[in-house]
Amino acid sequence: MTNSPIADLVHHPERVQSPSLVNSKMNGDAKAVTEWTEPGPAAFDFRSDTVTRPTEQMLAAIAATTLQDDDFRQDPTTLGLEAWMAELTGKAAGLFVVSGTMGNQLGVRAHLQSPPHSVLCDARSHLVTHEAGGVASLSGAMVSCVTPVNGRYMTQADLEAHVNRGTLITDCPTRLVVLEIPLGGVILPLDKCRRISEWARAQGIALHLDGARLWEAVAAGAGSLRDYCACFDSVSLCFSKGLGAPIGSVLVGSETLRERARWIRKSIGGGMRQAGVVCAAARVAVEATFLGGLLKRSHARARDIATFWEIHGGRLTYPTETNMVWLDLEAVGWTPERLIRRGAELGLRFMGARLVVHYQIGDEAIGRLQDLMLEILVSGLVDHPRDS
């Protein structure tokens, strides 16, 4: 019996071609460049690792995926990804969500069920600065922000100094601590993370990790996924930043937390039908980019960029521990706006002094960046000579 075309694609996803490539071949072109075949503008974009483009391998996985209904919990691809992520992180269950913001907000709300309650977190964290006040609107909780004394990452001492124990009738007690690892590319060391975990659990305070870029900390050798995730009651990990998937994150934790988060996800419109379409790409992202070692290459490039900047007289505002390079522009008399404008003239995209080096950044972009760095440093030394 002859296999059907669909069955052939399921067993041989590498044979899948994008529509534009098929049309190109029909028109006689030998090879077409599509949005899926190369990174395009992402190769020159240092704004964020969210600009990474999905790959042809992901497209093949999408074309070969299962198409069952996830609201009925019947899609093998979606269930398989969730179970696999739970296994990788050492948790009991996982839940696919459309974004890191949704993963964080579901995690927070799943923990906070009886107000009054407050959340303790770093003042610079994504939860505070980039999630549209979701903790207040979705969980009815107060956020207490902490600025780490060391200027890099939260410590047990920082938390102890700001925890609200709810001893007075006027208090809003701390019920949840949310950490972000890494934050701004800086890693919270595993031993300090474990101390925070032991302290919080002794206080009866739950712990959630915004691990959108936890992959980067693991790739840097700070600890394994299981090591870090063991410190928390829930963890959100993103597939669409440095890993390059088009969409999605996963929330991992206990089965009870997963079921509560799934109910909340549905209540805010996050339930999905044929979720295998995006889960298939997410699995490829983990396998090819994280397990395939591409993040380590990005880290090496980031270190090279940081070293180039420093050996030519530049300063960094944070150490380069993962894929982010923080330039001290103020020290050389440049503003973020000036960097953005000049970068655009050179075909480079920046969002400020933070450079994010993802795995699709090309050699040409690195060369242009180095030329720009020299320009910045020369002009800065002329305009703002340093004390000898």
UniProtKB/Swiss-Prot annotation:
Pathway the protein takes part in: Secondary metabolite biosynthesis; terpenoid biosynthesis
GO molecular function: L-allo-threonine aldolase activity
Cofactors that this protein relies on: pyridoxal 5'-phosphate
Keyword tags: Lyase, Pyridoxal phosphate
Gene3D superfamilies, per database record: Aspartate Aminotransferase, domain 1 (3.90.1150.10), Type I PLP-dependent aspartate aminotransferase-like (Major domain) (3.40.640.10)
Keyword Lyase tagged: yes
E.C. number: 4.1.2.-
Modified residues (N6-(pyridoxal phosphate)lysine): 241
Any one of the GO BP annotations: terpenoid biosynthetic process
SUPFAM superfamilies: PLP-dependent transferases (SSF53383)
Biotechnology: Viridicatumtoxin and its derivative, viridicatumtoxin B, exhibit anti-methicillin-resistant Staphylococcus aureus (anti-MRSA) activity. Moreover, viridicatumtoxin and a C2 acetyl analog, spirohexaline, have been demonstrated to inhibit bacterial undecaprenyl diphosphate synthase, a potential new target for antibiotic development.
Cellular component, GO annotation: cytosol
Protein purpose: Aldolase; part of the gene cluster that mediates the biosynthesis of viridicatumtoxin, a tetracycline-like fungal meroterpenoid with a unique, fused spirobicyclic ring system. The first step of the pathway is the production of the malonamoyl-CoA starter unit for the polyketide synthase vrtA. The aldolase vrtJ may be involved in the synthesis of the malonamate substrate for malonamoyl-CoA synthetase vrtB. The polyketide synthase vrtA then may utilize the malonamoyl-CoA starter unit, followed by sequential condensation of eight malonyl-CoA units to form the polyketide backbone.
PANTHER family, per the entry: L-THREONINE ALDOLASE (PTHR48097:SF9), L-THREONINE ALDOLASE-RELATED (PTHR48097)
Family note: Belongs to the threonine aldolase family.
Designated name of the protein: Aldolase vrtJ
Source organism of the structure: Penicillium aethiopicum
